[in-house]
Regions:
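Oligomerization/assembly interface segments of phage tail-like spikes and tubes
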Residues: 1, 58-80, 197-218
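Polar/acidic, low-complexity leader/linker segments enriched in S/T/G and N/D
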Residues: 1-45
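Surface-exposed ligand/attachment interfaces on beta-rich extracellular proteins
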Residues: 11-14, 18-26, 53-58, 115-126
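N-terminal ordered "arm"
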Residues: 27-74
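Short, hydrophobic/aromatic-enriched beta-strand segments in well-ordered soluble domains
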Residues: 74, 177-185
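Short, conserved charged micro-motifs
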Residues: 79-88
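Extended beta-strand solenoid/passenger and fiber regions
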Residues: 87-160, 183-218
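A surface-exposed beta-strand-loop module
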Residues: 156-177
């Protein structure tokens, strides 16, 4: 069975010319009709805290940006000819070999950026990492769909979209040029468990438990 990616409706017209970055060969976790709207999502950081006898602390932050942990709930999963969602779900889990391989996930509530800053030209730098912003906080994005890149509000000159969300300009943007982009992005993820169970409730309907996974770095 093919694994069909969820593409935001506004992006459908751009599919024929879409460019993926850092996503070659990776399956996309599909959206299932029986998927519960209740989704758990949490940023996770890595911090070492050493407390002395006096109560003072020394804290060390090891990550420059968080990993995101997700948990999806499936209320009903169909398992019948023409609507075998259970087979599709097991397929992506087995293709990923549980925790081993990566896949892509789109969060319908957090998959689009508009005029996001990702750097300022200095006249010599050609390579820039695309980012997305949460208020004043910015973090890199690695799997990008059909980005529109601007230099100080005007269409950017020649560039290539490299793996892991990097933009490489043919000519370095001039000093002071503001670089922005708009488009869609996916989270690169892996499953948090090596087992995926489901419970049969009728002849052709199954109930799934939670599906847990975390974003990863390339």
């Amino acid at each position: 069975l093919p694994i069909t990616p969820f593409i935001p409706p506004a992006a459908v017209s751009a599919l024929p010319t879409g460019i993926w970055s850092g996503a070659a060969g990776l399956p996309v976790l599909p959206f299932m009709p029986g998927q519960s709207p209740a989704v758990t999502k949490a940023p996770k950081w890595s911090t070492e805290v050493v407390r002395t006898a006096s109560g003072r602390e020394r804290r060390t932050a090891y990550w420059p940006s968080p990993l995101w942990q997700f948990e999806l709930q499936y209320e009903v999963i169909r398992h019948r000819p023409g609507a075998d969602e259970l087979a599709i779900l097991w397929e992506i889990f087995n293709v990923s070999q549980g925790q081993y391989s990566a896949f892509l996930f789109v969060d319908p509530t957090d998959c689009q950026v508009a005029s996001a800053a990702f750097g300022t030209g200095d006249g010599s730098t050609k390579t820039f990492q695309l980012q997305r912003q949460l208020g004043s906080f910015a973090e890199p994005v690695y799997a990008v769909f059909d980005p529109t890149v601007l230099e100080s509000g005007s269409p950017a000159g020649a560039y290539t979209l490299e793996p892991n969300g990097q933009i490489v300009f043919a000519a370095a943007p001039a000093e002071g040029v503001a670089l922005t982009w708009s488009g869609y992005f996916y989270f690169g993820c892996r499953f948090l468990e090596d087992e995926l169970s489901a419970e049969q409730i009728t002849a052709q309907l199954w109930a799934g438990k939670s599906l847990k996974f975390t974003s990863i770095r390339p």
